[in-house]
Amino acid sequence: MLQNDTIAAIATPPGEGSVAIVRVSGPDAISISNRIFSGNIAGYASHTAHLGTVVHNEVCIDQALVLIMRTPRSFTGEDIVEFQCHGGYFACSQILNALLAEGARAALPGEFSQRAFLNGKIDLIQAEAIQQLISAENIDAFHIAQNQFQGHTSQAISSISSLIIEALAYIEVLADFPEEDIETERSLPVQKITEALTITQELLSSFDEGQRLAQGTSIVLAGLPNAGKSSILNALTQKNRAIVTDIPGTTRDILEENWVLQGKNLRLIDSAGIRETENIVEKEGIERARQAMSQAEGILWVMDASQPVPEFPAILYQKPTILLWNKCDVASPPQLEVPFQQIFVSAKTGKGFSELRQALNKWLHTTQLGKSSKVFLVSARHHSLLHAVHTCLTDALTGFQEHLPNECLALDLRQALHSIGNLSGSEVTENVLGEIFSKFCIGK
């Protein structure tokens, strides 16, 4: 449902800054803005910028640069005016209040993006990518969101939809002319459904990798008690995140810290020291440590250079592992021939941490996105709907093999198209739209 009113909001985050932006969109955006600006906004051409003074009730608010983008050549598809004023809280707030006093309505979270979607400027997948771009915490999450916003995900979904529509058209012909001998034509919809299934499966298979790239690679620090795992976590992140004492078994639970290394996100996981114990609480912590090791993508096995070398757990041989010798400022570690990279550090002095960061960086850059157009799913909503599409296509393919009635096959394909419609936004409900855009910031 298209909106008829004019909305306004501050588009920049609160606080000190060189520039703040107030955005207005809607049928009366130009006339409302014109009433508070010293220049003649109504006479300005689209996509031009003009310097002037914002005045309301004969009071000068601020000098501002005004940008005009006329319908339909704007982000929302409506007339848009943006006021670029001095940063800080008061100038932009007073400009917004003036716009509201002249008839604009305060925008809801994500309402500008929602209008762009409703006016056909972007689809729902691209709209969701805007929030992902804003909230990206590392360079991979940014590239994934950028690819989605540029339409690469939408193109893949559109390909699936086109193949299903072609298959459905063949099936409807078969249903309309059952007396005709066109059995050989049944291979055509099977081919289209198979192609659609292949693309769908590729997208579904990208979900775990997309989640890892967007959320960060999980690296667990594990080892015997008092080896210095918590000290290493604190040293790497440069935070006093974990409690450090000389008492073995201080860490009883999993402690996770996000850390960005050269644009890549790591989830560093500190864990309880692994040993035999009768303490019930410590036992639970050790079990969680083992679970963290099994679920992590890499292990930093921390050893005390001054202590005897214990037997290594089997899981170290099954995952990317670095053998991290700590406390090398007070003891020399033994010479071992093991299939792991060995790094010698001191959490106390900082020795060896440059080499450790280089090794971790090498791990992280095994997947390079850069300007690649590869599509990764990261949204649970997208994954759920595509899984429904996959189920419907699989059922349709099975139905062909079992010679089910064409009406049953057509029903499966229509259900698949319905899920795709929910994905792209062509059939989405207002409740779903409200839930999606409510997560956006105001002014976007």
Swiss-Prot record:
The keyword Nucleotide-binding applies. The keyword Magnesium applies. Residues 216-365 form the TrmE-type G domain. Its EC number is 3.6.-.-. K(+) binds at residues 226, 245, 247, 250. Belongs to the TRAFAC class TrmE-Era-EngA-EngB-Septin-like GTPase superfamily. TrmE GTPase family. CDD domains: trmE, TrmE_N. Homodimer. Heterotetramer of two MnmE and two MnmG subunits. It is found in: Cytoplasm. GO terms for molecular function: GTP binding; GTPase activity; metal ion binding. It is an enzyme of class 3 (hydrolase). Its main location: cytoplasm. It comes from Chlamydia muridarum (strain MoPn / Nigg). Keywords: Cytoplasm, GTP-binding, Hydrolase, Magnesium, Metal-binding, Nucleotide-binding, Potassium, tRNA processing. This is tRNA modification GTPase MnmE. Coiled coil: none annotated. (6S)-5-formyl-5,6,7,8-tetrahydrofolate binds at residues 23, 82, 121, 444.
